[in-house]
From Swiss-Prot:
Family: Belongs to the venom metalloproteinase (M12B) family. P-III subfamily.
Keywords: Calcium, Cell adhesion impairing toxin, Disulfide bond, Glycoprotein, Hemostasis impairing toxin, Hydrolase, Metal-binding, Metalloprotease, Protease, Secreted, Signal, Toxin, Zinc, Zymogen
Keyword Glycoprotein: yes
Residues that bind Zn(2+): H335, H339, H345
Protein name stated in the entry: Zinc metalloproteinase-disintegrin-like 2a
Compartment list: Secreted
Gene Ontology molecular function: metal ion binding; metalloendopeptidase activity; toxin activity
Protein residues bound to Ca(2+) 1: E202, D286, C390, N393
Note: The disintegrin domain belongs to the long disintegrin subfamily.
């Protein structure tokens, strides 16, 4: 017989209700003081981790007992999670701290099916929970008795200021056609399987130097802020079957590595360039968010590029650290990340079931935890139309560093599936009690899984995006769609106007259209003669500050030149460039530069048969 030791830490409601207090969350006008009672059943003599995988607390809210069930947010960190900061002399310092035994949890209130919770248990309980449709916050009180906590409604937190707070994405709803409802989309079985497949976003968060100053160089406080935000992000994105893993944070402790200014569009552009040139080369990730303490322009508290997920430059966002409350900053980050996932602002016709909507253009005083029906439909449409490839990269089971626990929505070593606790599981393929597939089933999720069985061999699971792409089909032996492949590089495309390169057909004309609009075309050869000079922005190669002119045969592999509409008797050579990103405006690699010739990585026009 296994002996069980029942460990109980007393928690009772303190016989006092405060009228006003200053807490870490701000000025609170009405609160209750409680003492947590934690009940944990442990085998006698078993080693107890610092932070258990599951915990249970009992306390009273408004005089009524509640039971808070908490489960550690497994998968919050990736195996290769790293932290980067900078020494006073500017040296980059990267560490890989152990994060197995972290203290961030999701949870629910017993007997409240609509309840949620996002809690840090690092030093007492700090976070928020939803009870009977209302948002409550809990945090430790700085009293001699360290077990005392304050519990209060979100509505009892005084507003920090009355100024409106908005997203910087501008949009004229009247210019858009009505959103086609998900039920109106004529989805193929392959598309439906793709939508049902779980997605993963590997996230990096960068804290700028103003954040460092705001938190008085306390890197622990900055980390705690970021961890709490990402813990809430994960809770929000369960609605889209998306898991967010924090793969790294970077703190610009010495100075900013870009020019962070209040003009949010400029800062976002500079951050995207830095991410593409620097961050992606040393840290694999899908999306990066800049967390800044600078006061962005006007009422703006965030900005992101719509529909840019997985793009090397544009899969980014900027979020102002605008509130003392972690949840408010987390909701803003969720909003900007949703823009990256193809979701625009909600219009008046959008519905969140009477709750504040995450994609409202203006920040609600009450935290928005739900996506509207419009957001869901736009997100699905974006996924179907764009198929962002990076979010299907499922972390390996062995990459999850903490011990497995069944019921946390994350498949770990020894598990075949994980659909949450039995009360919440809606997956007919998975036994929620054991995290094993039910008898007679082969799979629970994937582009090649349908009704718990592997899709038959030959069933298309990824359509070709262009004539340079290849459609992939299921093997009949796996729930996963095979690796995305494309036609061989150098294959003629677009009626011999280009050659395939990494699944696309780059041409000079298409690049001109992307920069200058639909009326733009490639300029005459005389414009490209400017690249022969090797002066200013007109060249083929650059090494540090030194530039090299193009050889005559390579001039169409340097700076791109276009003309805008009919030119008459004069030619206006149009080009574009950026001081922050020197590759912008250069001819793309793989572009046709002559009959049977393409631009290679050193910007030479070479024979297509020897280029790859």
């Amino acid at each position: 017989m296994i002996q069980v030791l029942l460990v109980t830490i007393c928690l009772a409601v303190f016989p006092y209700q405060g009228s006003s207090i200053i807490l870490g969350s701000g000025n609170v006008n009405d609160y209750e003081v409680v003492y947590p009672r934690k009940v944990t059943a442990l085998p006698k003599g078993a080693a107890q981790p610092k932070y258990e995988d599951t915990m249970q607390y009992e306390f009273k809210v408004n005089g009524e007992p509640v039971v808070l069930h908490l489960e550690k947010n497994k998968g919050l960190f990736s195996e290769d999670y790293s932290e980067t900061h900078y020494s006073p002399d500017g040296r980059e310092i990267t560490t890989y701290p152990p994060v197995e035994d972290h203290c961030y949890y999701h949870g629910r209130i017993q007997n409240d099916a609509d309840s949620t919770a996002s809690i840090s248990a690092c030093n007492g309980l700090k976070g928020h929970f939803k009870l009977q449709g209302e948002m409550y916050l809990i945090e430790p009180l700085e009293l001699s008795d360290s077990e005392a906590h304050a519990v209060f409604k979100y509505e009892n937190v005084e507003k920090e200021d009355e100024a409106p707070k908005m997203c910087g994405v501008t949009q004229n709803w009247e210019s858009y056609e009505p959103i086609k409802k998900a039920s109106q989309l004529n989805l193929t079985p392959e598309q439906q399987r793709y939508l049902n497949t779980k997605k993963y976003i590997e996230l990096v968060i960068v804290a700028d130097n103003v954040m460092v100053k705001k938190y008085t160089s306390n890197s622990t406080a900055i980390r705690t802020r970021i961890y709490a935000c990402v813990n809430t992000l994960n809770l929000i994105y369960r609605a889209f079957n998306i898991h967010i893993a924090l793969v790294g944070i970077e703190i610009w402790s010495n100075k900013d590595l870009i020019n962070v200014i209040s003009a949010s569009n400029v800062t976002l552009d500079l951050f995207g360039n830095w991410r593409r040139r620097v961050l992606l080369r040393r840290k694999r990730h899908d999306n990066a968010q800049l967390l800044t303490a600078i006061d962005l322009d006007g009422p703006t508290i965030g900005l992101a590029r719509v529909g840019s997920m997985c793009d090397p430059k544009c899969s980014t966002g900027i979020v102002q650290d605008h509130s003392k409350l972690d949840v408010m900053v987390a909701v803003t980050m969720a909003h900007e990340l949703a823009h990256n996932l193809g979701i625009n602002h909600d219009g008046n016709q959008c519905n969140c079931g009477g709750n504040p909507c995450i994609m409202s253009a203006t920040l609600n005083f009450e935290p928005a935890y739900r996506f509207s029906d419009c957001s869901r439909d736009e997100h699905w449409r974006y996924l179907i139309d764009n198929r962002p490839p990076c979010i299907l990269n499922k972390p390996l089971i062995t990459d999850i560093v903490s011990p497995p626990v069944c019921g946390n929505y994350f498949v770990e070593v020894g598990e075949e599936c994980d659909c949450g606790l039995p009360a919440h599981c809606q997956n007919p393929c998975c036994n929620a009690a054991t995290c094993k597939l039910r008898p007679g089933t082969q799979c629970e999720d994937g582009e090649c899984c349908e009704q718990c069985q592997f899709t038959s061999a030959g069933t298309e699971c990824r359509a070709a995006k262009s004539e340079c792409d290849i459609a992939e089909s299921c093997t009949g032996q796996s729930a996963d769609c095979p690796t995305d492949n494309f036609q061989r590089n150098g294959r003629p495309c677009l009626n011999n106007n280009g050659y395939c390169y990494n699944g696309k057909c780059p041409t000079l004309d298409h690049q001109c259209i992307s920069f200058f609009g639909s009326s733009a075309t490639v300029a005459p050869d005389v414009c490209f003669n400017l690249n022969l000079k090797g002066e200013g922005n007109f060249y083929c190669r650059r090494e540090n500050t030194r530039i090299f002119p193009c050889a005559p045969q390579d001039k169409k592999c340097g700076r791109l030149f276009c003309v805008l509409g009919p030119t008459g008797n004069t030619i206006s050579c149009q080009s574009t460039y950026s001081q922050s990103d020197l590759d912008i405006g250069m001819v793309d690699l793989g572009t046709k530069c002559g009959d049977g010739r393409v631009c290679n990585s050193t910007r030479q026009c070479v024979d297509v048969n020897t280029a790859y």
